[in-house]
Each structure stands twice: as C-alpha cells, then as structure tokens.
C-alpha cells in the first residue's frame, strides 16, 4: 500500500509540475499578447516613426498588416481567425461592417482627444454620433490637371466635356465615381436612385467618350507624373502624391458638388487587446501625432488642432482644405443595397463597353 501511495504521490507531483509549467507559459503568452497591438491598415498609410514612438511611450509592440482594398479587409475580418485590434476602413465599408456586427461600439470613457476632431467631420450619415469610428484622414474627389498641357484649367465637372480635351482625360475605374461626377454635372446627387436621372447621366457620359484617354486605377499616378495625360479624375490623397512628384500638376475640387470620403479608425470584433486599441486611438488623436502623420502621408487631417500647426500655405490650400461653402456641397457615398449596387455596376460596365 505504501508503494501505491508513493506511486500516486509521484504522479501527482509530476502533474503539478506540468501544470505549473503550462500555467507559466500561458501567463507569459498572455502577458506578451497584452503588450502587442495588431493594426490592419492601407499600405504606407502611417508614418513608421509614429509606430516606434507609440511603442516607446506605451511599451506595446505593434504588428502592422496591410490591405489594398476595403473589400479585401472586409473579407478577412468577416471570415474570422484574425486578431486585428484596430482597422482603418472607408466610410461606406464602416456602414456595412456596422450593420453586420463586425465592429465594437466605442467606449468614449476610454477615449481622450475627440475634441480635437473638427465637428464637420463627426456625426456623418455612415456612423451617427461616431458610435463605431474615429476620423483618421479625409478627402475629396476632384480633377488633377497638367497646367502645361491645357490652355484653360478645368474647374467644374462640365469642363471635362470641352472639345479641346479630346483623348486627354483619365477616369478613375469606379462606378460610383464616374456615375457620380456625371450626376453632379447635371446638378443631381451622386447618391441618386432616380431612374430618369441615371438615364440622363449615362447619356451624358457617352458624350464624354471622345475625351477619355483611359479608365484606370493606380496606373493614373504614372500617367500624370510622367506627363502622359493632361487631366485625371482622382481622389485628393492620390492627387497630393502626384503633385509632390510633378510640379506641373494642380488639383481642384469642383465647387458645385463632389464626393467627401473618410478613412476612420475602428475596433473590429476580432480585437484581442482592447486596451491597446484605445491607447493607439488616443495616441493618434494627439495633435502632434496627427500632424506628423498628415505631413508624412500627405492627406488631409480631420484633427483641427493638428491642422493649425501645418504651414500656412498648406492649410490655406482650398484644393485639400476646401472652404466652408464648398464643403456644404460635398456628399459621402451612401451605402447601397445589393439591388442598387448592381444597377450602378451594370450601368458603368455598359458605359465602358460602349466606349470601346
């Protein structure tokens, strides 16, 4: 019997030792995870020095992963199996993710610095009261042009139809963007669901065909930077990168109407470290950090405290910081259901096929 007790005691001792090792390893892993932040963002969309600064200030290591489209980001988070703590989707995707319960409602008792964000960038239709997102960058859809290749600068959407721009215009390859500029040129909302307005818009876009050089996406940068196209319809962030590399380029936002876009910080349901997520959001809300990020990326900051620290020529540039009157005429893309997404896509596809 003593041998049995000794044997059982030995087994128990081994179990306790193994449990202790397992507990120690789990504690180390949990401790390491609690000191790690996983960010899911667009490529080259943050100053790398800010990530280093965040780690220095908080002790939290950053794992930075990138995506190249909102759809790719959505799919990966929707499928699960990821541990992203913070993501940076665009406004229409925030709406979609919110409706599909993929985002964590924000706890504003843990957020510091929201007062630095301009009120004009808050409480947008895609996220009322900013229940799920905090503005990161914003911008517009407009016209970039080469002043050495046009006699008169295009300032309005209607200008694109001028005969002197034959085979000169690069359009962004997007249904909402192209149909939107057509709708705006006729005085309609870029979110129109009026069949008559859409028919009128498509007819007018067909008339633009002789002026279109190509319908492209990222390739537009190369064309414009290398003086291979006179005019492009693109987003302000893309335009700022083009202007930086070609002094002949200018960017203008048609004052009659255009698109206002946002990329916002959210906490996905995949979050593993909420404390680190809030720490990062608060870090990016600090004016000095938002300023550094805006100067590196070249996009417009929604942080008004940071904007005040920008060079005068930058913050007074109405192309990237439009005045209040222009802002009144800008619209975000409203989320379309499957039916209307299909209608816009079909109309755009028909337009592209026609011009060939």
For each predicted feature, which ranges?
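Early extracytoplasmic/lumenal segment of secretory-pathway proteins
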Residues: 7, 20-96, 109
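A bilobed periplasmic-binding-protein/Venus flytrap-type ligand-binding module shared by bacterial periplasmic
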Residues: 142-149, 183-187, 261-273, 281-284, ...
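Mature extracytoplasmic/periplasmic domains
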Residues: 268-328
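A ligand-binding cleft/hinge motif common to bilobed small-molecule-binding domains
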Residues: 93-96, 225-226, 231-248
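Conserved C-terminal helix/tail region of periplasmic/extracytoplasmic solute-binding proteins
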Residues: 324-356
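Extracytoplasmic ligand-binding site segments that recognize negatively charged/polar headgroups
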Residues: 83, 88-211, 215-228
């Amino acid at each position: 019997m003593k041998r049995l007790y000794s044997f059982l005691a030995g087994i128990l001792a081994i179990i306790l030792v193994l449990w202790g090792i397992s507990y120690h390893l789990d504690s180390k892993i949990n401790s390491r995870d609690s000191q790690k932040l996983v960010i899911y963002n667009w490529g080259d969309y943050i100053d790398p020095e800010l990530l280093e600064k965040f780690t220095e200030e908080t002790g939290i290591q950053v794992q930075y992963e990138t995506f190249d489209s909102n759809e790719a980001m959505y799919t990966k988070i929707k499928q699960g199996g990821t541990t992203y703590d913070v993501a940076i989707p665009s406004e229409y995707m925030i709406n979609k993710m919110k409706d599909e319960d993929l985002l964590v409602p924000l706890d504003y008792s843990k957020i510091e610095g929201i007062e630095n964000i301009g009120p004009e960038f808050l409480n947008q239709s895609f996220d009322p009261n900013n229940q799920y997102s905090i503005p990161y960058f914003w911008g517009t859809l407009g016209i970039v042009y080469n002043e050495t290749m046009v006699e008169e600068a295009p300032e309005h959407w209607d200008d694109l139809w001028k005969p002197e721009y034959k085979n000169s215009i690069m359009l962004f390859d997007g249904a909402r963007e192209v149909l939107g500029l057509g709708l705006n040129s006729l005085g309609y909302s870029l979110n129109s669901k009026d069949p008559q307005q859409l028919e009128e818009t498509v007819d007018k876009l067909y008339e633009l065909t002789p002026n279109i050089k190509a319908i492209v996406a990222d390739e537009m940068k190369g064309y414009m930077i290398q003086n291979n196209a006179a005019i492009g319809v693109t987003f302000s962030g893309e335009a700022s990168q083009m202007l930086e590399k070609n002094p002949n380029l200018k960017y203008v936002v048609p004052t009659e109407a255009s698109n206002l876009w946002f990329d916002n910080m959210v906490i996905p349901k995949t979050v593993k470290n909420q404390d680190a997520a809030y720490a990062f959001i608060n870090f990016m809300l600090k004016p000095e950090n938002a300023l550094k990020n805006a100067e590196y990326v070249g996009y417009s900051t929604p942080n008004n405290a940071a904007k005040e620290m920008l060079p005068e020529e930058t913050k007074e540039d109405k192309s990237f910081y439009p005045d209040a009157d222009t802002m009144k005429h800008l619209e975000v893309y409203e989320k379309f259901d499957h039916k209307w997404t299909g209608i816009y896509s079909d109309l755009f596809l028909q337009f592209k096929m026609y011009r060939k």
